[in-house]
Amino acid sequence: MFAIEKHFSKFAKFCGLKTSAERGYDPMEETMKALENDTMGAKPLSNSLLYEFGEDSSGVVFSKDSIGCWFEIAPIVGSNDSIEKNLTLFFADELPEGGYLQFLIVASHDVSNILDMWEKGREHGGEELNRLTAYRRHFIEGLASDFSNADDGRLARNYRSFVTYSAKDNGEKGVEALLKFKKKLHNKLRAENLSPRQCTANDLILIGRDILQMSMSKQSKPKYNVLNNLSDQIALPFEPNTIEIDQITHHKSGLVSKVFAPKELPESFCLAEMINLLGSDYRSIPGRFIISYTIANNLGAKGISAMNGAGTRSIHAAEKSYTKNDLVAQEEARQWVEVKALHKRGESFLQESMLVMLTAPKEEIEIAEEVLKSLYNTNDWKLEPAKRIMRIASLAMLPMMQYSYWKSLKFFKLTRYALSGEVVAKLPIQGEWRGVPTSGALFIGRRGQLFNWDPFFRIGGGGNYNFIVIAPPGAGKSFALQEVAQSMISKDVAVFVLDIGASYKNICKLLDGEMIQFNHQCNISLNPFATLAESGAVLMKALQMIEQRIDAEEIQLKTGLSFERIEALKIGKSGASAETKESDGIEILEIKGSDELGNIKTHFVTKDSIIYAKAMLSTMCGVNGDVRGEAIIERAINEGVVKYGTRLDITKLRLVLGDLKDGKGEAVEGASRFADCLYPYTEEGTHGRFFASGADASFKKMLTVFELEELKNDEPLLAVVLQVILMQITMQFLCGDRSRRFMLIVDEAWLILDFAASFLERFARTVRKYGGSLGVCTQDLTSFSNLCGTRKSQAAILECATWKLILQQTADGMAAFSASDSYKKHVPLIASIRKCSQNKFSEVMINTDGATVVGRLATDAYSTAMFSTEDTDFKFLMQKEREGLSKHEAIMALSKKYGTLPDLAPIRNRSLRVNNI
């Protein structure tokens, strides 16, 4: 039909008649001309992309003339000699001929995945913590996008590392070969602890857009549609950009991208030094950057033969008489001798290519470029813009596009020859620690990696939940601990703080916590012995069910015990070693005897609770380390449990001690002296008001602060109160809420460490199995020193902490670390830890098995005002409260000193919309 119309149109035109309904022109033709003019000849970006479709089940991505696969990996943190050797062998022996392996790292400003996980875990704490969550998220997202202030040390990033592989599409055989190598690659990455994750088509859409069409605004997560071409889904419409000589201008976002290639390489380099290309400890690259490094096994037998031939000719030429004095020829020959020797020992001839993309706002791109070049120059790399080939260079950085664009890169001299051992040193797989995969306290690495720290997460599954904080006055210790406390409360962890100095007053009041001040007006009574007799009742019931082989889920349902405690009961009943039972097992003791009325009673108590009580009473009686004395006290505890049951207290224990008889019916030698030592803590004693029976304290708030300022000059009493509180809390969770986790923070522990070391050691060894975390905070490492040989418990407390947090140190503090065999290797890093002079952040070295990193604690204005321990801020808040403002209103007023807070309503609404997408 259309052909007939076309012929009639030509005929009409030949006869001088008008066409197209007598209008004399073709509307479609005119429209296309106008469109060409409107768009200035622009073509859809997707037309330049080669992706066709992705198969998520197999992980294969099909493109025009090529196929590929890819993984996201965890970065290497720190130096690792073995991985260099292993990857060298892998590249030499396993990289298929015709294969292209790309290592890609994206220093993204998009930290939403990290913040989503962080926010998702924060389900408790009420309105105040919800408000803090919203302010903190807005603050961190602002830091991640604020390239102009990158030099303040708070530019947050999310480094994402990928390994991609591409090869020619040879049909079914090609796919089979790809899948075979994909399996080998996955196994190798996993063997090197790089935690490979097979990427999907959704990942490709997201990363492809981030490379080609970066946006500073929050984007919805893409969803791959199998019915449509993959390239069309990567490139968004109506996102115009202009390719210029030395940059790509993104008109909608106002951003500019530049691609660079190394013009000169350092003479020597190692894998551990690649971290320096991500930024320095004190200077960030003020823009989003991407590093793409590709190795290609594409020379074939002919190419390898040509390489060897070139080397042989160079060596022979250097032996000629006319080149004996030619230093250049001699040096070239020497290098060829070395290269041929390495090749003979198994290293392969490969090709390599490296590209770096930098993206920043148009008005800031020149500064960002200068910082990038300066950073690379410092490390003996010289970068040059890929002038006139920005389009090809940017497309060649896309995942799995290296096979397709290699010839173009080679034509423009962006490839080099290299040996398989040489390329490993340039792999961009170094990075910063990504933290734990659970919500916790937020930190920013020195090079920007945003991460969570949660003491309840055990790396590798080993260790406990304890942590040590070492920081002198003024280093930001109390500030950091308040951040840890609020992070735990938001996860339904009950937090108890033993404080000296009222540092936690604001956060306690704001979060509706309980502040208990030990002074002459204090009417609280602590009696951990009241629940001692029943400490093992529920556990014994669970143990009987375990012996009946009842399922753990049913045991949990009937007893309320956590799976962790049920497992601990199994270990306690097993034939495990004494050391394993102490740290991981719960053992139940049966105590049987006559009560006051002569009735036979049986009590089931935990072994740990008896040991806690013995350690506490030993401190009161001054017999720590005295085997006989501690044995007498243990006997008194057992008899007290039998005689008084849940009515047991210190006054009654004193009576039991005074009445102890030996096998001959005579008074036990020394027992009466111990009873006298307990007198100050009885009903009639000076400190009896703290320990009387009847008013059994129960701490139900999510945050409880024990303010011990007025006891700090009586260190023995302070040590006793500390131990009683710790035992009381543990017994509460042992006999009451048996599924909730709890954290005990002992601030300024250096004051009482020598008086309560034995108790704290035992507590540190055992609290994990009851769901508890112990945080001990001191001013320097000497608090845990055992150089004299008599402070084994103090040293053990340090050893029993899986996590160590170290803040900025004084000269004396550094001397202690330098003298420690355990910390000598970390001395340079510890010495570099600093608190920002402008109070924008405090650095914390986080040390555990498998990770030693530095994180920067940077908080929003609201949190800063809430956590502040500055005298002027305390006075300001008190004045505002006297004026009638609530604590929240006073903190809002103080926050203006530290920054501007956004209106929460639109933030929360936007977050809700994004979460619903």
Would you name each region that the model predicts?
Residues Q449, P455-A475, F479-S487, V495-Y504, ...:
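Conserved P-loop NTPase motor cores
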Residues E84-P96, N298, S394-F451, F457, ...:
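P-loop NTPase motor domains
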Residues G440-Q449, F456-P472, V484, G625-G658, ...:
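Charge-patterned, long linear interaction tracts outside catalytic cores
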Residues P75-V77, A107, Y165-D169, A360, ...:
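Short, flexible loop/turn elements at secondary-structure junctions
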